[in-house]
């Protein structure tokens, strides 16, 4: 299924996958895999993504 919430939040912040990756210290491929639902990020990485995108863990990682 993927994580469309991260992609939507990233696009709203006008970040490319590469820009988000650099801000959280991972590769662009990691961000791509998270968005595609093919990678389960660590809690530390989840928190980093939330901080950069100005969202909460619930906003981005809680399933509706």
Show the residue positions of the predicted features.
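Recognition helix of helix-turn-helix/homeodomain-like DNA-binding domains
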Residues: 26-39
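DNA major-groove recognition helix of helix-turn-helix/homeodomain DNA-binding modules
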Residues: 44-59
